[in-house]
Design a protein with these regions (language model features):
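N-proximal low-complexity "stem/linker" segments adjacent to membrane-targeting elements
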Residues: 1-39
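Short loop->beta transition adjacent to catalytic acidic/histidine clusters or analogous donor-positioning motifs
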Residues: 17-21, 39-48, 57, 67
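Conserved sequence signature across two-component system core domains
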Residues: 26, 50-53, 72
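Acidic helix N-cap motif at the loop->helix transition within catalytic regions
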Residues: 31-35, 56-65
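A conserved acidic beta->alpha catalytic loop
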Residues: 51-60, 105
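Acceptor/aglycone-binding surface of glycosyltransferases and processive sugar-polymer synthases
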Residues: 68, 73-88, 97, 109-187, ...
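Catalytic donor-sugar/metal-binding loop of nucleotide-sugar-dependent glycosyltransferases
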Residues: 161, 182-185, 194-212
Length: 237
């Protein structure tokens, strides 16, 4: 099974971009999310944002950008938002592929499209973006060390030998999206997804991606806090 369904009303002849949903967790990103969605929809017209209890105008800005918005009444965490978004997108019978995509401008649609095309042309269930397959992504020393530690721990715990275990840019076919169970609401969902790849014996590959650490994301202290969250995930799970 390659994730495509040959007898489904000619879906194979439909451009891959139109058979893909972007799943975008959203929390207090009103400043940038409209531009991110408008840019992404130039390639992928189907975008669902899960507003995870934002206290700003994130939901309105995402809608203005052309996304479908599903809202959590309170902040549940990124894992919960991904689960809600995948559940929504799986309800589209014409959808073959699902991409988890950040709302703050760090992910590039060019990378997402390459990953989806890999799913469409190769016997794969899931493609994980990696910042370590080339030198385009500029990482701080502490971030690089933490991510390398994450790789070691994930290999030991799941047997899945990724080079970048905590990259949020992922492309899944329908089989993978239906098979992976996300019970961890917050940052531990990243490790959970890797474990689910091993548990379900999903066919996986990595693709080089360029993650853009912008002035905006740095101003929020995201890189530092993500490193702390990853360490907490590794040692407390």
């Amino acid at each position: 099974m390659d994730g495509r369904i040959p007898d489904r009303s000619g879906s194979i002849s439909t451009p891959v971009e139109q058979r893909t949903w972007l799943i975008v967790p959203l929390y207090n990103e009103a400043q940038v999310v409209r531009g991110v969605i408008e840019s992404a929809r130039q390639t992928f017209p189907k975008v669902v944002c899960v507003d995870d209890g934002s206290s700003d105008a994130s939901a309105a800005e995402a809608r203005a950008g052309g996304a479908v918005v599903v809202s959590h009444p309170i902040n549940l965490g990124q894992g919960a938002a991904l689960r809600t978004g995948l559940d929504y997108a799986l309800g589209d019978p014409d959808a073959d592929y699902f991409v988890t995509f950040d709302s703050d401008g760090q992910h590039r649609t060019e990378d997402a499209l390459h990953m989806v095309r890999m799913l469409d042309s190769e016997p794969l269930d899931i493609v994980i973006g990696s910042r370590f397959l080339d030198n385009r992504t500029k990482l701080s020393p502490i971030k690089r060390v933490v991510l390398r530690l994450g790789v070691v721990f994930e290999r030991m715990s799941s047997g899945v030998k990724l080079t970048d275990a905590h990259n949020g840019l992922r492309a899944l076919n329908r089989h993978a999206a239906e098979s992976i169970v996300i019970d961890q609401n917050r940052m531990a969902h990243a490790s959970e997804i890797v474990a689910e790849i091993g548990r379900n014996e999903l066919r996986w590959a990595e693709a080089p991606v360029h993650v853009l650490y912008t002035d905006y994301s740095k101003s929020k202290g995201q890189s530092v806090w993500n490193s702390v969250n990853i360490l907490s995930d590794l040692f407390l799970k």
